[in-house]
Amino acid sequence: MRTSQYYLATLKDSPSETEGISHRLMIRSGMIRKLSSGLYAWLPTGFRVLKKIENIIRHEMNKIGAIEILMPIIQPSLIWKNSGRYEEYGLELLKFYDRKKKQFVLAPTHEEVISKIILKEINFNKVFPINFYQIYSKFRDEARPRCGTMRSKEFVMKDSYSFHLNEKSLEKTYHIMQETYKKIFNRLNLDYFVIRAKTGKIGGFISHEFHAYYNKSDVLINSYKKIFDKNNIINKFKKKIEIKNLIEINAEDILLTSDLAKKFNIDIKQIIKILLVHSIEKNHPFIAIAIREDHEIDLQKVENLNQVKKPLKFANYYEINKYFKVKKSYLGPVNIKCLLIVDKEAHCIKNFVSGANINNKYFFNINWDRDVVSYLVYDLKLCRKKYNNKKNNNSIEIGHIFQLGDKYSKPLNYSLLKDYNKKKIFMGCYGIGISRLVSTYIEQNYDSNGIIWNEEIAPFKVAIIPININFSIKVKNFSEEIYYKLCNLKIDVLFYDNVERPGIMFSNIELIGIPHILIISDKNLKNSIIEYKNRITGDKLMINYKYIFDFLLQFNINFNF
């Protein structure tokens, strides 16, 4: 996509009535615009993000055999009266009459509709258990809409409904759905937790809520800004770390890092350990994971990597000895004979210690990009948090699952004849607030420049910023060539072909949060290089333009659903 053909809609400042960091950034980055209280239009950038989150959810739901359908948002009020929820919902349920004086409601949820339609059909087909889902708009007449799409009147939701002949079958699907929700939120890299919850207006007898942390108030947001600014000031005055020469140390029979640290007086945080997992590549059967010695890897994060074989499996002693010809304790990142993936916190360390891939030897003062040049960086660290079984004051509900029993099937008088005995129909329902997920993600992933999207849900995965495109034919032609090649590789790319000052282009691209940024300039092209910036890590690299596509493809940015 070219910016000259795209509605970027970014703003220098956010309107005064915005509430919370996500609301401000969504307005400023041109994702949404307010129509009325609690009602928002999704502009192109926001709509792209929304659709990518929908596709992740759709992919995970399809994997467990759920079937996608679509139901009307307008529902007869009679079915709500039959279920007993017409009065229970009160003013949140928007009611109206058609020209024939028949009353309808705008749906906040679809339990009544799915029960009426599907159970009547299944009465003849007898297909159990079965799980349906839809991704569609809902409406709730909120008394106090706030924080943009965090709490709005109209919102996009994934709601699903399962039907069963017994409670055991319902419990099994309920567990599968709970694990599926975890996979969805893990793919979004959300910081969330699960709690047992009240069933509320939906009803039923068991329910769990998924909550994500967010900055609940302007006071909290401002305090975060102060901390952020303070850290920036401190970093400016930190003494620059001297890069030391690489040293090979003979440490015979030291197999424990605790012994290594004690003998050489090393801080355990300066030691990098290597873990080996099985790869999907037959010719390259292993992947090395580099992480700080005092950290643990998150198994789910590692298994989610596209390069890793599923289910996750670690290399055993015999495989390590056969393939690498070295004991596990002496494995290290320097010249390792496989793909190397580095945890982002391990990547921040300078002058670290690790194995030399030779028995009884270690390297001291290893540095990334000098001693280790080929690797990928991901967030792989396990974050341990202690959560009370209570709603956290600074969290927001992003998902809710219920075991409903026969609450909806019983009032509608649906049962199934089987073996000449009437059987109850048991239901489960499962919801995810998709438009709320967008806001929640931003609350957890931003900096002073704007939003920080991960590759899967970013509106664009690559941005091309040509410097002085209106003055340099070489910059223009080369930028066009890069753009067409990326498009042919099916990569979402935004080509900033408007004539703007570099500062404005950088500001807009960082504001909307595109993960990979290519900067094309005359100065660099003379040296056959392109400047690359990673929006997620902040890393900057100079890359020979011959290898730019291979470099970008290592991030699997052409992988779409």
From Swiss-Prot:
Catalytic activity: tRNA(Pro) + L-proline + ATP = L-prolyl-tRNA(Pro) + AMP + diphosphate
Signal peptide start and end residues: none
PROSITE patterns: AA_TRNA_LIGASE_II
Superkingdom per UniProt: Bacteria
Cell compartment(s), UniProt: Cytoplasm
SUPFAM superfamilies, per database record: Class II aaRS ABD-related, Class II aaRS and biotin synthetases, YbaK/ProRS associated domain
GO cellular component: cytosol
A GO BP annotation: prolyl-tRNA aminoacylation
Pfam families, per the entry: HGTP_anticodon, tRNA-synt_2b, tRNA_edit
UniProt keyword Ubl conjugation present: no
Role, per record: Catalyzes the attachment of proline to tRNA(Pro) in a two-step reaction: proline is first activated by ATP to form Pro-AMP and then transferred to the acceptor end of tRNA(Pro). As ProRS can inadvertently accommodate and process non-cognate amino acids such as alanine and cysteine, to avoid such errors it has two additional distinct editing activities against alanine. One activity is designated as 'pretransfer' editing and involves the tRNA(Pro)-independent hydrolysis of activated Ala-AMP.
Name recorded for this polypeptide: Proline--tRNA ligase
Organism: Wigglesworthia glossinidia brevipalpis
Gene that this polypeptide is encoded by: proS
